[in-house]
Amino acid sequence: MATFHFDLVSPEKIAFSGEVEQVDVPGVEGDFGVLAGHSPLVASVRPGILTVTIGGKHEKIIVLGGLAEVSEKGLTVLADTATSLADLDRAAFARQIEEMESNLKNEEPGNELDKAIARLDHFKVIQQHITSTGMH
């Protein structure tokens, strides 16, 4: 299978840089897969699980929003946060969800509350995926 260059960058680190076969990205407008020769695009990334395929093996990385750009050079994802599932502190992630739920009680109805609910929903989907697929 043809490969292309993929960079996953967060403010803290370069989480991944190398040749890959495929990357599945959690997009705001819907998830999308990128293969070698993909048409150029720019898309917003929602909190979710990004899947990198190398040599037929899949590496799962949690991203918490960001921006993806496909160009002739490959795919670059600028993520707000990027953490490999292998490195995830599941207890801290669960506490973060509990804190988000608690903070919802303090939000006034409106746009900010809607955003907080949507973000919490994304986090819960990630948590469900981790527990339902045995990634713990």
From Swiss-Prot:
The keyword Cell inner membrane is annotated on this UniProt entry: yes
SUPFAM superfamilies with a match to the protein in the record: Epsilon subunit of F1F0-ATP synthase N-terminal domain (SSF51344)
Gene Ontology MF, one: proton-transporting ATP synthase activity, rotational mechanism
GO cellular component terms listed in the entry, alphabetical order: plasma membrane; proton-transporting ATP synthase complex
Domain of life per record: Bacteria
Sorted UniProt keywords: ATP synthesis, Cell inner membrane, Cell membrane, CF(1), Hydrogen ion transport, Ion transport, Membrane, Transport
Gene3D superfamilies the record matches: F0F1 ATP synthase delta/epsilon subunit, N-terminal
Record carries keyword Ribosomal protein: no
Membrane topology: Peripheral membrane protein
Subcellular location: Cell inner membrane
SUBUNIT field: F-type ATPases have 2 components, CF(1) - the catalytic core - and CF(0) - the membrane proton channel. CF(1) has five subunits: alpha(3), beta(3), gamma(1), delta(1), epsilon(1). CF(0) has three main subunits: a, b and c.
PANTHER family recorded: ATP SYNTHASE DELTA/EPSILON CHAIN, ATP SYNTHASE EPSILON CHAIN, CHLOROPLASTIC
HAMAP family noted in UniProt: ATP_synth_epsil_bac
Recorded family membership: Belongs to the ATPase epsilon chain family.
Role of this protein: Produces ATP from ADP in the presence of a proton gradient across the membrane.
Full protein name: ATP synthase epsilon chain
Native organism: Afipia carboxidovorans (strain ATCC 49405 / DSM 1227 / KCTC 32145 / OM5)
Recorded name of the encoding gene: atpC
